[in-house]
Amino acid sequence: LRGVTFKVIAHGYCSPFYRNDILIAHGNMKCYFQTVMNKKPNRLSGSGLLSFYERWAGAFSKNIWAVSNKVKSEWNELYNINSHKIKVVRNFINLAQFDYTDVNEAEYVTFVGRLEKGKGIDDLYYICKNLPDTSFHLVSSIPAPQNFASLNNVLTSIAVPYAKMPEIFKKSRVLILPSYYEGYELVTIEALCCGCPVIGYNVGAIRELYAESFPGVFIANNKEDLAQVAYKLISLDNEKYYHLRQTIYSKRELFSEERYAEILTAAFNEKK
C-alpha cells in the first residue's frame, strides 16, 4: 500500500533477532525465575534460554512498551536496556463487561490464576487451612494440588469461560493473589472494575495501584499477614463493605479503553 507506514510489533521473547518497532513486555523472564526459584537461571535451561531471547528481543527493538513501572525497571537493570526507549503502557479491559450490576451477597474469598508455585500456591493453601470458617473459590485452568482436597471450605472451578468471570467477581468478597511475581495482571483490574477489593503481595498491578492510593487495593508482607488482611475484609459489616465496593467502582475509568487510547497515542507520538 503506497503511503502507508507499518509498525512491526512483537511480544516478549517471540522475535529475539528481528528489528521490531515496538516490543510489548508483559513481564521479565529472568526476574520471574529469580524471584520464584530464588536463584539465577542456568543459561542452558528453558528459563535461561527464554531470558536470553528476551534480552536480545529488547536490544533489537526500537521501542519497548512495558506494562508497569516495575517491568520497565527490570528490563533496564537485568537486561541493560536503555530506559529512554522503554515506555509504560498499561493494560485495559472492556468496562461494559465488568460492572457493578447484580452485586449482592458477596460470599467467597476468590483466587484466580494457575495453581502453581509462582502464583503462591503454598501460601494459598496455608491461608485456606487457617481460615476454616471462610469459603474460598479457586478459579484456575488446572486442578488444585491433592492437599486441597482435605479442605472442606474450598470450591474449585476449572476452565471457567471468560464471559463468566464478571459473575465470579460479583460473588467474591475479596480477590486474594499471593503471587510472587506479576507484570500487570488483568485479573486485578477485572476484579476492581466489579468493585471487588484485592489483596496480595507487593507485585504487579497491586504494587502499582497501591502506590497510587487506588481504593480497595491492599498489600500484605507474608502469608500470615495476607490471611489477617483477608479476615479483616470479610469481617467488615455490610454497610462499610459495600461502601468500599462502590468507592472502588467509582474509579474504574482508569482502566477504560479510552484511557488506554490516550496512553497509546502519547507513546506512539512521543519524540525520540
Regions inferred by a protein language model and the residue ranges of each:
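Aromatic "clamp/platform" in nucleotide-sugar-dependent glycosyltransferases that forms part
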Residues: 180
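Membrane-proximal helix-turn-helix segments that form the acceptor-binding/catalytic region
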Residues: 43-64
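Nucleotide-activated donor-binding/catalytic signature segment of Leloir-type glycosyltransferases, i.e.
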Residues: 145-166
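Conserved acidic donor-binding segment of nucleotide-sugar-dependent glycosyltransferases
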Residues: 216-224, 232-238
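Conserved donor-binding/catalytic core segment of Leloir-type glycosyltransferases
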Residues: 65, 102-119, 125-131, 137-139
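Short hydrophobic beta-strand element within catalytic cores of glycosyltransferases
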Residues: 197-200
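Carbohydrate-associated surface elements
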Residues: 70, 92
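Short alpha-helical donor nucleotide-sugar binding micro-motif in glycosyltransferases
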Residues: 167-172
